[in-house]
Amino acid sequence: MTVPKKRLSSSKKRIRKNIWKGKGHWAALKALSLGKSLSTGNSKSFFRFFSMPTRFFSMPTDNKKTKKS
């Protein structure tokens, strides 16, 4: 198992930790922005399937007419 040769300085540790946290912060901001644009309908990168006409999704619901008793 590999072991670091020297102890990492606290400033370098803090810098790396802040970089790691910053990446998560930007990812969260992008996700919130995308969710906001999807909810308002301003998204240009996703299709909104629920705004399509209903004739594409209509399915026969009355099975009594098709069944023979």
From Swiss-Prot:
GO terms for biological process: translation. It is found in: Plastid, Chloroplast. Keywords: Chloroplast, Plastid, Ribonucleoprotein, Ribosomal protein. The keyword Membrane does not apply. One of its GO terms (molecular function) is structural constituent of ribosome. The keyword Ribonucleoprotein applies. GO terms for cellular component: chloroplast; large ribosomal subunit. InterPro entries: Ribosomal_bL32, Ribosomal_bL32_plant/cyanobact. Belongs to the bacterial ribosomal protein bL32 family. This is Large ribosomal subunit protein bL32c. It comes from Pelargonium hortorum.
